[in-house]
A protein has these predicted regions:
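N-terminal interaction/assembly modules
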Residues: 1-127, 131-153
Length: 153
């Protein structure tokens, strides 16, 4: 059985994927809360930390533009709009956790979880792509920032 956080990430992925799909199809009748609540109800007995799922979904939506801006230079040969929707969603989730939850979840765990989601839901090459982009993001955005802050001391 999947760990509680892993299952939470699956629910977040399903929610974000469906919400993006429906909004791009100009379905104005749906709200992200509606989609999230429906998905949480499906797994209600298995998910203990619903706040984690809600924070992840809301954070990715709130920071989507900034997350996309961070992904672009890391994967310049793949315009964000041309990355498969599932891969794009996994990248956004992973990057959000790397940037905003590194104090709660170790970066290597975040990357591994994203790779596992890509293996389960993406294409044959998704896991390698996700691993490469998030690994580069970790090295350039997180490690470099940490190195710069210690160098200034």
């Amino acid at each position: 059985m999947a760990s509680n956080r892993h299952l939470g990430r699956i629910v977040a992925l399903q929610t974000l994927y469906e919400y993006e799909f429906r909004t791009q199809a100009e379905d104005t009748t749906v709200s992200v809360d509606e989609v999230l609540n429906r998905n949480l109800e499906r797994y209600e007995s298995a998910i203990e930390d619903k706040a984690f799922v809600k924070e992840l979904v809301e954070g990715v939506i709130r920071e989507q533009s900034a997350l996309d801006d961070e992904i672009r230079p890391i994967a310049p040969e793949w315009p964000i709009e041309q990355i498969a929707r599932i891969d794009r969603t996994i990248l956004r989730m992973g990057l959000y956790e790397l940037l905003h939850r590194a104090d709660v979840v170790p970066p290597k765990v975040v990357i591994n979880e994203a790779v596992e989601l890509a293996k389960a839901f993406g294409s044959d090459n998704s896991s390698k792509f996700v691993n490469g982009v998030l690994g580069t993001a970790y090295r350039t955005l997180i490690e470099d920032t940490a190195h710069d802050s210690t160098a200034e001391v």
